[in-house]
C-alpha cells in the first residue's frame, strides 16, 4: 500500500478508526524501512463546535499535526436531499479530500476502514443492494488522475482497539438515527451468526477472493453488465 517517496494524506474524521490510522502511519513513517511523507488532513464539513474542539484536543494528545479545512458539505447535502443526505454527503466529502490532498502534493489518501467495515459492506451489498460488492484495500481514483485510495487498517479487526474512547460519529445526520442504521443491523446479524459459527467473519471476508464466476448469472465490469449466456455455448 505504501511505496518509496509516497506522499499520503491521512484523512481524519475524528473517530477512533481515523485516529488509530493516523498514529499507526506516523509510527510506520518513523520506524519503517521506506521513506514517505504524511499530511494529516481533517475536513470540517460543519461539525458542531464541541465536536471540533474534541478532535483538536485528541490530535494534540496523540501529537498528530492535523490540518483542518472548513467546508459547508453538511448544509449543501441537506439542501440537495433533505430526507436522505448521507449518500450525497459521503460523495462530496470524498471528492473534497481528494481535491485537497492533490493540492497539497499528495499522491494517495488513506482512509480508516477496517476488517469489519469490509465484511459489513459485503453483507450490505447482498442483503440491501441486490449485488455482490466488496471494499478493496487500494483503489485508483476515476476522477483525480494519478491519485490512489488506500486502506491500511484492512486486516485489523475493530475489536482490537474498540475500548479506546473517541468520537463514535461526528455526523449530525446520523447521531439520532444510528440505532436504526442498516450497517448496525448487519453488525448485529454477524454477531448473532458468529455464535453458531466462530469463523463467520473470516468466511465472509474470504468470499471476495473465492468467487466462482462459472456459477454466476452475471457480473459487471467497468459499469457494463455481462450475462452468463454470452459464453454459454463456448464452453460446450
Walk through the language-model features, giving the residues of each.
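ATP-dependent adenylation/nucleotidyltransferase module used to activate substrates
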Residues: 1-124, 128, 159-166, 235
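Alpha-helix boundary/capping detector
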Residues: 51, 85, 123, 127, ...
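The feature marks non-catalytic terminal segments
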Residues: 166-236
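Secondary-structure transition/capping residues
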Residues: 3, 32, 36, 134, ...
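Catalytic subdomain that performs nucleotidyl-dependent activation
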Residues: 38, 108, 116-192
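Short, basic, helix/turn surface patches
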Residues: 90-104, 137-144, 189-209
Amino acid at each position: 500500500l505504501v511505496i518509496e517517496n509516497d506522499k499520503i494524506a491521512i484523512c481524519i474524521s475524528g473517530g477512533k478508526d481515523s485516529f488509530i490510522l493516523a498514529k499507526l502511519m506516523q509510527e510506520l513513517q518513523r520506524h519503517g524501512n521506506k521513506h514517505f511523507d504524511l499530511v494529516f488532513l481533517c475536513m470540517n464539513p460543519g461539525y458542531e463546535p464541541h465536536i471540533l474542539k474534541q478532535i483538536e484536543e485528541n490530535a494534540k494528545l496523540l501529537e498528530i499535526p492535523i490540518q483542518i479545512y472548513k467546508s459547508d458539505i453538511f448544509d449543501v447535502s441537506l439542501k440537495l436531499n433533505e430526507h436522505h443526505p448521507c449518500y450525497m454527503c459521503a460523495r462530496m466529502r470524498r471528492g473534497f479530500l481528494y481535491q485537497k490532498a492533490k493540492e497539497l502534493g499528495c499522491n494517495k489518501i488513506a482512509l480508516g476502514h477496517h476488517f469489519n467495515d469490509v465484511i459489513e459492506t459485503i453483507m450490505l451489498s447482498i442483503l440491501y443492494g441486490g449485488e455482490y460488492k466488496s471494499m478493496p484495500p487500494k483503489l485508483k481514483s476515476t476522477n483525480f488522475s494519478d491519485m490512489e485510495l488506500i486502506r491500511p487498517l484492512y486486516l485489523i479487526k475493530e475489536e482490537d482497539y474498540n475500548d479506546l474512547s473517541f468520537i463514535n460519529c461526528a455526523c449530525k445526520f446520523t447521531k439520532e438515527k444510528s440505532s436504526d442504521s442498516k450497517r448496525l443491523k448487519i453488525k448485529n446479524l454477524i454477531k448473532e451468526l458468529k455464535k453458531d459459527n466462530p469463523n463467520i467473519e473470516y468466511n465472509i471476508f474470504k468470499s471476495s477472493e473465492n468467487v466462482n464466476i462459472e456459477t454466476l448469472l452475471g457480473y459487471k465490469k467497468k459499469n457494463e453488465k455481462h450475462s452468463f449466456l454470452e459464453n454459454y455455448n463456448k464452453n460446450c
